[in-house]
């Protein structure tokens, strides 16, 4: 999520509630059982909450992002009261309860958000970045994301390489077919290798004729010549850091 909090601050200052919570309407497959689902009235105030139970698979749920705007003196007062309890709660749960108790203003976020709670959701969130509208929503020019800079040489694409709908970091050598994938730095993809719908971390080497499909290869993984590594869209295969794969998997 990449939200402009200035807008949330502005709306928070116009309502009488001491707490504002940001929520997003989400499909059931994008929510886990640790997420809070909000009950919101017609005036956009929170009236209740519950943990997600997935009882209605077709519904959109008001999932709390656990992003809160609160009045500072009010929050300090509530936290001081909490620490004197025999079993004080963690801050996340305190804020969730306060949102219901004090009728928090509910701010609906309509941009891109990925709720990562499993290998499959992590895999899907990364591949979402291959869709232009989702990429631009997360990395908006008006709401910059600053990352650690690595000044390396550009990735080299050999004449025989075939690239479709993929993203590449710098410093790699690509001689292979790469479709619908995200390739990190210093990766070497040899001739006649095929990479489809996969995430390759830094330093991965895929040798000649190998096939990687619906997989997540951690740092330094080596896939030997002619080997197939294949998961599925629903259950991507994860190869641990530094592994050398000499036999077919999947």
Give a label for each model feature.
Residues 73, 81-250:
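Left-handed beta-helix
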Residues 1-127, 239-240:
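Unchanged
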């Amino acid at each position: 999520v990449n939200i402009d909090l200035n807008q949330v601050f502005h709306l928070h200052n116009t309502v009488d509630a001491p707490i504002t919570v940001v929520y997003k309407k989400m499909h059931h497959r994008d929510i886990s059982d640790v997420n809070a689902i909000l009950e919101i009235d017609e005036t956009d105030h929170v009236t209740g909450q519950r943990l997600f139970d997935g009882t209605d698979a077709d519904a959109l749920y008001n999932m709390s992002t656990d992003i809160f705007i609160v009045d500072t003196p009010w929050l300090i007062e509530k936290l001081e009261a909490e620490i004197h309890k025999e079993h004080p709660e963690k801050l996340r749960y305190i804020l969730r309860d306060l949102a219901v108790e004090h009728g928090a203003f509910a701010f609906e976020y309509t941009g891109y958000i990925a709720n990562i709670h499993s290998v499959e959701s992590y895999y899907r969130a990364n591949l979402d970045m291959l869709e232009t509208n989702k990429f631009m929503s997360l990395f908006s020019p008006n709401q910059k994301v600053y990352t650690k800079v690595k000044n390396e040489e550009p990735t080299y694409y050999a004449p025989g390489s075939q690239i479709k709908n993929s993203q590449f970091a710098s410093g790699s050598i690509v001689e292979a077919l790469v479709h619908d994938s995200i390739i990190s730095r210093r990766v070497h993809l040899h001739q006649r290798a095929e990479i489809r719908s996969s995430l390759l971390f830094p330093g991965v080497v895929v040798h000649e004729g190998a096939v990687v499909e619906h997989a997540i290869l951690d740092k330094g993984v080596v896939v030997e010549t002619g080997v197939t590594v294949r998961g599925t869209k629903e259950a991507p295969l994860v190869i641990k850091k530094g592994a050398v794969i000499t036999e077919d998997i999947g």
